[in-house]
Structure formats: C-alpha cells, structure tokens
C-alpha cells in the first residue's frame, strides 16, 4: 500500500481483512455534479438552464407577427468572493446574461417573411453559485440544499389492500404521474366498474376518456374483449370452441361432439378434458339456445329491410332478440367472451353506466368536471381536453417518466415523447383490467426503483422555469401591443419575477437549510442527506409506517441506521458510503462482477431495478487466492431475500463491508457488535460533537476518518505536488514540481488559511498548518488541519482513560464522573464565537447615532469603548457591558421642518435621546476578537470605521505584496537559470540588481526568446498585481450596500472559552450518552498499580440492557493501542537504536491476518523517527465496520503491549488507597463533548415579560421566561399539604396582576406580606365558558 506524505507521519494499523477494490467516492459529488449540470452549457439542451430556456422560448405574440427567440446565455463573474459575501451578508452569485433575438415578421408579405431582426444581451437576475464545498452563501449565511426523494414520474398500479370498502374487497387502481401536469387515475369501485379521475377530482366512468378520444362503443368493446362466434343451423346453435376458454367452468349441458360426450352436465371442466378436446380437434360444439341468453352482443345488429337496430352493441341478448335476429336473416352472431375467473365484464359494465353517447358529449362531461359552473362550448371543451395530457406546454412525463412508463406497460416506441397518446391510455387501462383479472402484480411504491432523487440542480432548474413562465405571459402581451419598431428585447423582459423565483427557492424553500456546521462530519452528512419531505414530497403527518421503514432496495443505497429519532424518523435518510445517482436520478450501488465463479475487480453500478434479477454474494464471503469462493454454499441476496446459494450461482459480490451504511455509521468502530437503535444514536451524536481546542485523533477508528476530513473541505489540501517553501499561521506557500507546471507560470501555489472565524453553530473554525518548510508534498496531501481534524484525520473528541465501575452513585442512570485532570489539561475546552450586531437606522424622528456619548451612563460603563462608541478588540466583557453605544431620538411630537433646522444649527438637546446601546447578553462573557463597521454609501465614516479600513488596506497590500514577491522570486529564479545557461556568471548576476536581469541580452536566439517571454510574464505579473490591489482597494473603501433605512451596521465578534463542567452532555460513539454529574479531584479517582488514575468513570449497568458491546471492545483495543505507545516511550527513554524500533514496529504492523502490508524497511530513517514521535501517544488502529479486529487480534495486541489479555486491571480507591475487590475493565474510549452545553441551557428569572391574554410568564430561555409549574408539580405540593406555597405559585408568582403589583410595593416598603387576588387565567376561563353561551358570574360572599 502506498502512503502519502501526510499518512506516513502516522500510519494507522488496519485490522481489515477484505481487500479494498474501490475507494470511497468523493463524498460531496451528489451536490457538486448536480449543480454543475445545471450551470454548464449543455448543447443537447437536456439539462440545466439551457433546457429551461429552450422549453419556454421562442415566445410568439398572440397575433403571430413577432417572436422572441433564445440564442445563448453566459454567466458573468461574481462581484465578491465567498469570504467577502459572508462578511457583508450578501449572496454569492453570478449575473446571468441572455442573448435574445426579436424577430418581426412582415404583415403584408407572405407568411414567414422577416421584416426585422434585433439581437441583444439581456440581464436576467443573479444565479446563486455553489462554493467548492457544495454549499451556497445566501445573505451571508452558508446553506445546503438537501436532495429530495420523491415518487418517480411514470405509471403505478396499486390496490387499497381491502381497506376502503367494508366488505374487504380489494380495489385496484392505476395512476399516471407526470413530471409536470395533471395526474390521471383509473380505479375500480366495489361494483367492479372502472372509473377515471383527473387531478384527484370527482370520478367519471372510464369509458368517457375513450369516447373523448373518438372511440365508439363497438371499438371500445373490440379493444378490451375477446369474441365468441355462434352460428344458427337448422334450429340448433353451433358455438365456435376454443377449449382453453372452458377451463374452470361448470358445464351447464353435456359437452359432446360426433356422439362422444366429453364433459357431463354439472361437472367441472378440467385440464384433462381440455387436452382430450384439443387432441380430437373439436372446434365446434352444439349448445342449447338458452346458453346464449344473457350473453352480450359485441356490435350492432340491424334489420337490413327496415333499418332498425335489433340488438345494440353491449346489449344482453334475450330469446326475443334471438328470434328477431334469425327472422332478419342473421345467421352468425358474435358475443363478448367473459367469465368470472380471468375475463371479467368490467368495461362492458362500465359502458352501461356511461351516459355519454359520442365524442362531444364526453368532452363536455370532462369540461364540466374540471370547470364546474362554466358554460361549456365545443371549442372550449376540445381545447381543455387537448391541453390536459396532449400539449407539451402543460404536460411532460420527462425522460425518466417515459422510460418508467414504457417499461411498465411494455411499450417499445415513443421513447422521446413527453405527452400521452391514445395507445398509452388504452394500455394502462388494459394492464389495470389484467391485474383485476388476476394477471400481473401491483407495484411496490416504496421500492427505490419507483422513487428517485431530485438534487439541487434539478430543483433550481424547475424554479427557474417557473420564473420564466411568469415572464412569458408578460412578454406575449407586450409583443401583441402596438408598434415593435422601436422595441428592443431588453424592453420586453423584466428580470424581477425570475430572480424572485430563484431567490425564494434558495432563501426559503423547505429543502434549503441552514448548514449544520458543528464539525466536518455534520457538514458532510448534511450535504448527503436525502429527504422525503418538502414541496412535492410527503408530509410528516400523512407519512405512514411503510414509507419510513427500511426497504430491501435500500441495501447499499440508503443507510438503514442513520435517520433522526422523532417525528421525522425514516423520512430523512443518509446516502450510503458508495451510493451515487444515475442519469435518471435513481440511486445505484457498486458490485464486483463474478465471471465463471471467479470474483473480478471489475465494478458495475446497479440501480434497484437492475439488481432484482441477480444473485449477489456478500462482501465477507471467503475467497481463495484465485478469486473463487472458498465455501460450497455462500450467503447471497436475490430479489431482496437473503439466503444460502451454491457458489456457482453468484453473479455479483458486494465491494466493501461498509457498503450498506452511511459515512457517519462507518465511523463507529465495532458497529457489528452494537444494537441498531444505539448505533443510530451513535451516528447522530457524532454530528453534534463540538470541535475541541486541541484535536486528538481516535486511537480506535475505522479507517475512513481521512476521507471525511479531506472531502469535507475544512482542511487545506495540496492542489499540486511540490516542496513547502514557507509556512506561517495564516498561509502556506508551495513551490510546484516541474512536471506539474503549466507552461509560462511562476510555479507557486499559495494557500491562505482561515483563522478564528465563526461557524453557523457558533463554534470556531480555525486552520493550523501541519507541514514544515522543505517538506515534499504530493497532490491531495493535507497541508493544514481544520477544526476537529488531526494530521488530516477526523478527530471529533478525545481519547479518555475509562473505568467501568460504580463510584458513590455519581454515575447513577448514565451520569458521568470526570477527573479534574481533564479540565486542567483543557481536554474538552471549546471555543465559541458569537456575532452581535448593532444597527443604526433612520427613524421618523431623526437618525440613530453610534456614539460614546450616552445619557445617564456612568464613566465605568464606557471604559471599554473608544471615542466612536465601539468596544476595543481584546476587551474582556461580561453580561450587561456596553459593546456599541447607540442613541435613538425619542420625540413626543414629530418635528416640523423649521424645528429640525433650528435643531441642526443649535445642536441636540441631550434629553431627547434614549439609550439603545448593544449590550452583552446576560449569560455571556468573553473576549472581543473582531469588530466590523459597515457604513451606507454617502454617510460619513466615523474614526473607527476609517481605522478598520486603513488596517484592511494595509493587510491587503501586505498580503498581495508578499504574494507578488513570492511569485516574482520564482520567476526571477527561472530568469537566472536562463542567464547562467546563456553564459553569465552567477557571481556577476548576484552583484547586479535583480530587476535589471530582464534587460540583459543573450547571443543564443532560443534563450533570448525565453528571456523575452519571462520579461513579458513579469510585466503581466506586475499589471495583475496592480489590478488586484486596485479591485481590493475599491471593495474596501466603497460604501456598503445596506438594507433600506439602515445607516450603519456594527458587528462585534465575541469569543467564549467553555471548559467542561457538570451538566454538559458527553457521549461515546456507540450511543452511550450521559451528563457529567461531578468533576472529581485527581487524588480521589481510582488508580492502577502504576499509579495512573483514570479520567472518567462510567456505569457498567449502561452496557447490558442497551446491547452496545462495541464500546467494551473499543475500550480493550484502546488499552492495547495506548500500551504500544507506552512501550515505544519506554524504548525512547532507554535510547535504543533505530533498528530495534524498526523491528518492533514491523511486529506491530504485521499482527493479525490483515490486508495492510506496512514495510517499515522502505521508510527512511527520518520517516521512522517522525512515525515514532507520532506513535508515542498510542498506536492509531483502524477496525473497519463489519470487518473489525477479532478477539484473538485484540488479545495478541494486549500481549504485545505487556498488558493482561483480560483487559482488566486491579484498581485502588483514590480516597482510601484500598484495592477494589474485583478487577475492573479499564481502557481508552473516544469521548465526544456534544453541543448541549449547560451554559446555553441554564436560566433563571426574577421578573420579566408576561403573556398578553393569560398574564402568565412566558416560557423558555429566549423569552426570559419562567419555569412551568404544571399539573404534577401541583399534585406534589398538595401531597405535602403546602397550601400557602401552592397559593402563591398559582397567584402572585404567576397571573394575579393586582397581587403582583401589591407584592412589589410591599417589598419596597419593607413589609413582607402578601394578599393573593384573582388569577387572570380564571377570567379567561370565564370568558371561554361565556363564548359557549353559558353565562357564569362570580358572586362575592356577603
């Protein structure tokens, strides 16, 4: 295995045994690919903006004299980059410019003669851009558009499973769902008539739609029924016999032919009888006349002589009609073939309840149903029916829909057509009737072949199309009005509706969500989330159990573990590790192909539909060296069922053991030993871990930590290989390798790092370099760690030394006892950054002002403000301190213009303003780390704003100059190389000024050309630098574009350091969560024989009932890993030679039968030293999901570390020094601190705001509310008999308005007594009873 430069620094020992056939694909591709498809110009016009434009344009005027055509579009450059957008609170977007062509036709000349053509580029609003990490910056905040799982367009056959009708009869239905347009439903009623509904409106007999398509009764019967022919011969009836049709019938007469009786009357016809009849070639049999009575005629029979109809099509034949027929000379009769078994008379029955007779009456009936109350005309009815399913503007099945539709009804042609046609409708009805007849199956709507993913690009395109359609109407009207000679395309198009539609989608759609930015994992999983909710999806209330449940087709596509607990369970899913979307939007998962019993490394991606017919072996099937299966019988899946199959039958095999689960679940080591419910909690809680001050890699991981850290985008990753030229806290410079250079560039890559910025969840984002100057790096190497990453690996928590034992009741019911050492070492200290904003507005009474001159505020309160009234950076502030001084005019009266003038001349009166300063919220204290001032264009900047501006300009200049110098240095080094090659001596060059080198000349023409090219590049570089600086300067100095009425915004950033404390929530990765009950002194904690105290004591009773045994194995393996680290430390102390270390490390990495082969001999001495340095804290271990370290390997590793193989140690009580009587399980567990901190939840109220109606205190910390004293609490006080306490709880402490004021007065007067009055909620109750019409009054006791 080849390790990258960063990986070599700390090689993770891998216990996985299955070879890695496929790397985990880029985790954010579902977002990025989809959006690229939307924005990329697609010559076919299938996807994205191009498709939206082509579907709406050209727009023709109503009179047909002109049309507006679409030519092409282009996206401009964004004004601000991502960081600037976040600071300024604007949307990161590109302007969309569309080239349109207005064609005006000559009215007087023949049709199609062009009179005038005008082309122009029109601005059509802004299109938000996706950042490199798959997010959008909307109004300054990072948002994610979650993909939606919705029902695929197509046709679905379903049944009500006998729930609708009381008899329990199963009613079948078919539904045609288009991508856009009206739904078409066919359904049976309990009487077996077939009905149709359009858009879920009232139902009509299904034959109406066929009549509206122009079919007569005869044609309809012809489509749906087989016929039986009868012949009248000398007073007897001969029936044409198709023996197969008799199957299952009871003979109502002797079936005989040529005197031979085949079936006696009253007997049932069996397969044997049919074979006999077929063998003897019987094709006609004689039937009694009564047999035909009650059969249904298949066409009209007319008396040729009189022209009257004897029998109508679809009319039952009676004896009388039979006599009339033979009288009129009809010798042959054709009737419909029906039976109760598999040829029901459904369509014939339906025609009888259909009141319409011809096409027009059917169209009118449909019109009445769709538009009740409007008088129907023939034209309107025809136009409506045409527009419902047959017009491309109104109806589109989409490519997916057509593909699903055709495969469902078995149609081969009409691949591209988006609308329905006659064949489609008839075929759907035929299939539905066939299903009712017992042939065919209903569809499973929860099958992933019937649900598809709608990603960002597709949703944005749909919204964009909605905007265009709104514009289309306006354009049509403008084209039809008056004179077009002076009109340009720009005058026709109003970009407002388009940008409004796009803005609404990105800003407030249910699927556009505020990004979960707790840690890198929560970012990645948020982007990989698949939601069944949202517009066009399900709603929480209506979603039943089936939709939420795990379906067999989820295997390898959606994770069965990771889903939220609560009302959304099963509706919000996560993409599995290897899953991807195909071109139709269906989820696919990869499988290894098995050819002639040999498993190959070729990988095929199969969708849920394709997977059905294959036998797929599991990833843990044992293989021989040559790739054949080792066992005769293997566990495999076919059609979603798991079972044992002979090895010859296998056609595919899973690619990896973690193929089934999502990224978050793949991060749980020993997941295979955890109960699913706990694994779900574990996966969800990792997303809530807060990044700690010093990230600490997990000792026991699963090997995909690196993928998450790198793909999440929080680390700085090398774009190209090279050598590190310089490193400081905020930037890394890489000199690029020669072979990766683009000809004619300076060959320097500069990575600017993010320092101490605020995330969406107020956690701290900070990048730290993890490379040193002179180190070689390759493309994809990690250069800097972000939050929660350590040497390029995800590190959500800390490795803690843990003991499973009770300790004085402090770990009762999942409480956690923590050692004081954890606090001292800042193991779980986190930094939180809050943004507080102060806005100065223009009010009716005059403008608000930001100033240090605040009325009635003492000197000490202003000590942290500068003269502009804004807090200093670095100031330590606590609750209630002023951050930004602001005064607002308060006027009893609005001023007249004259008064305003006098005020302006003679200055303000101090009493006319009130203090509205921005203060630190009550429960917060911390350090000011940054201040930003935004001033409206045209408003004078204050001193602080100018200082900040100067500082930003200085920094920008410094950054750009350094960048320029680095690039210039690279360029001049290449100039020097050329000059030396051309004969100049190095000493002479060093003596000359470097800028003059470019003016020197060379004899060699080729070298002179090279030199001139380099000189040109230098000029370009200089010009580029000047241009960049000018742009930057303009951005910094120009006024800001603020909301209407806002003059100035001051943003203050406050950093809070939170140490761990009782009440904080912590958890492991196995769903083992708890709250800290006590921080115990180190000397009281249990310690082992070496005197090493444990950090955390957990309750052993938290394990058995929860069945998450994975945590115990993790603890054992963690102990061994740490033991190896201790052993290396010991060797370092003894100063053993490097060879010994190499030998020991080789032994460690070779342990167990694993796929990983680490050759320590191939590492250089320096690399081994780095490795030793990084392993001293413990050997990092990977135990992949479902392929983890076996018990034997754990024991072997413990042995290697000289630790007891039981994983248990004798512990001593820290308080008494006595040994505990039993050995205790001690080891290292990876613990997370979750974002449920006691500081954010702790809250107390004295007095505050009250609810308007009930006059009771509000609830919740945000409203500064009170604690609810509910029903059960009242019972408790009743049980104690504490009557007075109860009385004050229900009156003066709650909603007795007069009592509250009296009590306040009494307290002020020093009189500590109370007089309870009437609670306001009692008055509310009285009023509510009165509203029911019952008068109820309180009478005083006199």
Swiss-Prot record:
Taxonomically, the superkingdom here is Bacteria
Coiled-coil stretches noted in the UniProt entry, renumbered to this chain: none
Record EC number = 2.7.7.6
GO CC, any one term: DNA-directed RNA polymerase complex
| Keywords of this entry | DNA-directed RNA polymerase, Nucleotidyltransferase, Transcription, Transferase
GO terms of molecular function: DNA binding; DNA-directed RNA polymerase activity; ribonucleoside binding
Example GO BP: DNA-templated transcription
Record's catalysed reaction(s): RNA(n) + a ribonucleoside 5'-triphosphate = RNA(n+1) + diphosphate
Assembly: The RNAP catalytic core consists of 2 alpha, 1 beta, 1 beta' and 1 omega subunit. When a sigma factor is associated with the core the holoenzyme is formed, which can initiate transcription.
Q: What does the UniProt function comment say about this protein?
A: DNA-dependent RNA polymerase catalyzes the transcription of DNA into RNA using the four ribonucleoside triphosphates as substrates.
Under the heading HAMAP family, the entry gives: RNApol_bact_RpoB
Q: Which NCBIfam families match?
A: PRK00405.1 (NF001616), rpoB (TIGR02013)
Family note: Belongs to the RNA polymerase beta chain family.
What is the protein name for this chain?
DNA-directed RNA polymerase subunit beta
